[in-house]
Amino acid sequence: MSETNINQGQINKAVWRACDTFRGTVDPSIYKDYVLTMLFVKYLSDVWQDHWDAYQKEHGDHPDLIRELMKNERFVLPPAANFYSLYEHRHEPGNGERIDKALHAIEEENIQKLSDVFQDISFNSNKLGDEKQKNEILKALLEDFHKPELNLRPSRIGRLDIIGNAYEYLIAQFAATSGKKAGEFYTPAEVSELIAELMAPAEGDEICDPACGSGSLLLKCANQIKNAHNGSKRFALYGQEAIGSTWALAKMNMFLHGVDNHRIEWGDTLRNPKLLEDKGRLRLFDVVVANPPFSLDKWGHEGAGDDPYGRYRRGIPPKTKGDYAFIL
């Protein structure tokens, strides 16, 4: 087994073990967002620290130069707004408030990429229990992500795909424990792969998923192009997701897979489509894939006859069959 495979398995197991902190006290449908967000923050922090150390070896006597170079990073982390600062203060009261402040600072520093991504999650929420329980849970979570197996520095793990794969692994595990609710944020990998193979997206394609969930299906389409064209990134991914917390998962999923050429919008595709041309017309795409919510009975039937975008020219779907609204 290669080092890459060993690392992938270790990382998958380690991030799943981090969930033990919540089990028995917080519902999985709630704590999944906390674990996935912490994985994202840990990755950003490890990349930042890795690159800082590399610059320090090269320009050790010029700290101002290092700070200037770090401004060009893919994601910029403000002072104290990183995993390691949070970990150092884990024994003190106020873990939830500190994490929330760090997320806000990271978002503000990277506003074009991360605008609103953390607005639906609060580590200071009473969903995690009273102040004492919450502080203990978050202390344990920080300690779980500080373990050697979750050293996510590029100099250690190599390919970014390993982190993206771990994120997808977590989403799949949460889906397996969520029953019917899993359909709100996840399409099984086997189904996604089959759809992507059948659609056979080509290099240069613009690909859309109007009910994108956590973005897994879009990423499978991206992988089809990468695998067929020596890792090519000549494609663009578009999506829209109605549930705010799931939209945030999709955004983080894209970044953890190194897919920055994406546009994922938050909103109800049927009632309020966001993927529009400059003149307000619906944008057209080379490939459209979806696993839409089935049998929606409140999808906007009452306004479909006056749809400003000219949809439903072939007829208006039944009031209780909103899935047809995605294909007519």
Question: Language-model features: where?
Answer:
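A short glycine-rich, Lys/Arg-flanked "PGG" loop and its adjoining helix->strand segment in the class I
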Residues: 328
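Short, surface-exposed linear patches
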Residues: 56-58, 261-262, 286, 310-312
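Mobile active-site "lid"/loop adjacent to the S-adenosyl-L-methionine
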Residues: 294-325
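Conserved S-adenosyl-L-methionine
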Residues: 181-290, 295-306
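Non-catalytic, mostly N-terminal accessory regions of nucleic-acid modification and defense proteins
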Residues: 1-203, 263-265, 269-274
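A short, mixed-charge helix-start or loop-turn motif at secondary-structure junctions
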Residues: 177, 232-233, 311-313
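Short, mixed-charge, low-aromatic patches
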Residues: 147-155, 283-289, 316-321
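Generic recognition of stable, solvent-exposed alpha-helical segments in well-folded globular domains
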Residues: 6, 10-17, 39, 161, ...
